Amino acid sequence: MIRKIFAIDLTPCDIVARERGAHFFPVQAVRELIAGDDVDVLETLVTLVERVAEDNPEAIASNQMNFTRKQHALEEAGARVIRAPAKRMPDGGFKQSDDQRLIIATLSLALRLRPEFVVLAAADGDFAPMVWELRNEGIRTEVLARPQMLASDLRRAAYSVIDIDDVLNTVGGAQ
């Protein structure tokens, strides 16, 4: 049996799903597709950005309720949620550490469980050092992304690239 860990950078995956007409990235359906025959998906990790609410009590409560709903839905789909709180920047923008949190969680879990593969749903070059380190440990990484959006350094580090649009077509992730 082949053992895999599925790690999802949720924000860009949700964007791709919405562009295709779906409401969200179908975590459970993609996980089941990855599992296929003779594959054990040991864990599914997914980042969930907690947005910064306005400073009034109603906005804070609404923000927390939305986060909790999405967290519960992801957990019901079999994912372990990695909370990534956003911070307000002085210029009014927001910064979150979701990539870094996913890198740390994925790397530590992979080094502990020693799967044959990590399936990484992400396209950002920030993940390339993690993929190289996994490779040094004998763990191959399949990257799930749009090939035209995939950072070149992540493409070089990956064992293989799977087109996210092909996967969403297979699982019925709208079109």
Region roles according to the model:
Residues 1-98, 140, 149:
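Domain-level signal for Mg2+-assisted phosphodiester chemistry and nucleotide/NA-binding surfaces
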Residues 62-175:
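Nuclease catalytic cores that cleave nucleic-acid phosphodiester bonds
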